[in-house]
Amino acid sequence: MSPQTETKASVGFKAGVKDYRLTYYTPDYETKDTDILAAFRVTPQPGVPAEEAGAAVAAESSTGTWTTVWTDGLTSLDRYKGRCYHIEAVVGEENQYIGYVAYPLDLFEEGSVTNMFTSIVGNVFGFKALRALRLEDLRIPPAYSKTFQGPPHGIQVERDKLNKYGRPLLGCTIKPKLGLSAKNYGRAVYECLRGGLDFTKDDENVNSQPFMRWRDRFVFCAEAIYKAQAETGEIKGHYLNATAGTCEEMIKRAVFARELGAPIVMHDYLTGGFTANTSLAHYCRDNGLLLHIHRAMHAVIDRQKNHGMHFRVLAKALRMSGGDHIHAGTVVGKLEGEREMTLGFVDLLRDDYIEKDRSRGIFFTQDWVSMPGVLPVASGGIHVWHMPALTEIFGDDSVLQFGGGTIGHPWGNAPGAVANRVALEACVQARNEGRDLAREGNEIIREASSWSPELAAACEVWKAIKFEF
């Protein structure tokens, strides 16, 4: 072996296993503006110190492996390694800690959510030293977020396209979600749109099944949109689900939607994958299509409080990957969602600059540097009695989506849509007049129902419906 080779590969190398904290726990590190910062909820195995567990997360999600390797000498570990720079105990929880990890920007491919997640959460969650691990939040630096296109259009461009301002948008998921023929499906779409809704929606698992192939559904839904627009004088849309088994098929469906003149398509971004979603978002911007995002499968990832990933991280990732709408819970309906935490990630979707606020689960200040915003969609077990609370909680820049709360109306789809539109307009007018929606909401709905028989019928049907489990 030549002396030169010894210097590169052998000198200073000592085989064996050493504690991660000796290399990856760096409490004196000052984070850089270009670092991606992560907050992990760490539950170590019994006997594993918190510092070692935090350092293990930093190591296994960046440059580390289980043993010392001689090839470490061929690069600069100090430049590329992740660093656990702070650990704090979680108040009220035994043996749980928040570990803060800083990742150098060079570890990540530009414009790739796929690569970012593969690095940060791809392997470390199965690590034996950890009983459980949850990614609570990420700080995406402008140096990285500017490598992404983001949403195809954003909130303001969507409002301009639709010519609708000063109120939340109204939607409806067509039910039953599976089993209708394409023509009957289109009829249901038409009735909802002519009744006053802005959008109707394919459910997440409506793709191209034997009872209703995608092309037939797209054609009948386009016919319904044009007919409803002609009758109401308003711009309408239906979320045509382009999700498919391959990216090529997905784009083919989006192309056909554009050829029909549809204003919006839809994608299941978690089951479809971030690479597919980003590809579709780029196509939508280039071709003037809005993109509605469904979060099917999210609860598999985010529901456990000590393991997985909080939805605020998935929401940030979606804003980077691209989408104009995303489902965000309701706070008041059938699906789980705590108010302050929900509003925290709603702000992360819509706003340009969001301050750190631990009471709302926001661990880092996030600057999106003018990346377009995403409309949060409230959907799941909501009806007309929820309208005041939804209007107050989500504000104007949102989509309120009533599936059963429209199609379950005793008089049919169109009266169900009328009831929702009247309830929304009443709440917006009351709010603009200075009334308190949280305190006077039921009274506002009753007043409106006195002159709207459709709303009165809806109020009677759902007056006692609650989801308390």
Curated annotation (Swiss-Prot):
| Co-factor remark | Binds 1 Mg(2+) ion per subunit.
Propiece residue ranges: 1-2
Any GO CC annotation of this UniProt entry: chloroplast
Cellular compartment(s): Plastid, Chloroplast
Per the entry, which co-factors are needed? Mg(2+)
Q: Where does substrate bind?
A: N123, T173, K177, R295, H327, S379
Annotated catalysed reactions: 2 (2R)-3-phosphoglycerate + 2 H(+) = D-ribulose 1,5-bisphosphate + CO2 + H2O; D-ribulose 1,5-bisphosphate + O2 = 2-phosphoglycolate + (2R)-3-phosphoglycerate + 2 H(+)
Active site as annotated:
K175 (proton acceptor), H294 (proton acceptor)
Question: Which terms in the Gene Ontology molecular function aspect does this entry carry?
Answer: magnesium ion binding; monooxygenase activity; ribulose-bisphosphate carboxylase activity
State whether keyword Ubl conjugation applies.
no
Modification(s) after translation: The disulfide bond which can form in the large chain dimeric partners within the hexadecamer appears to be associated with oxidative stress and protein turnover.
Give the enzyme class: lyase
On this chain, the residues bearing N6-carboxylysine are: K201
What exactly does this protein do? RuBisCO catalyzes two reactions: the carboxylation of D-ribulose 1,5-bisphosphate, the primary event in carbon dioxide fixation, as well as the oxidative fragmentation of the pentose substrate in the photorespiration process. Both reactions occur simultaneously and in competition at the same active site.
Q: Per its UniProt record, what HAMAP family does this chain match?
A: RuBisCO_L_type1
Entry-linked PANTHER family: RIBULOSE BISPHOSPHATE CARBOXYLASE, RIBULOSE BISPHOSPHATE CARBOXYLASE LARGE CHAIN
Its name, as the record gives it, is Ribulose bisphosphate carboxylase large chain
Q: Which gene encodes it?
A: rbcL
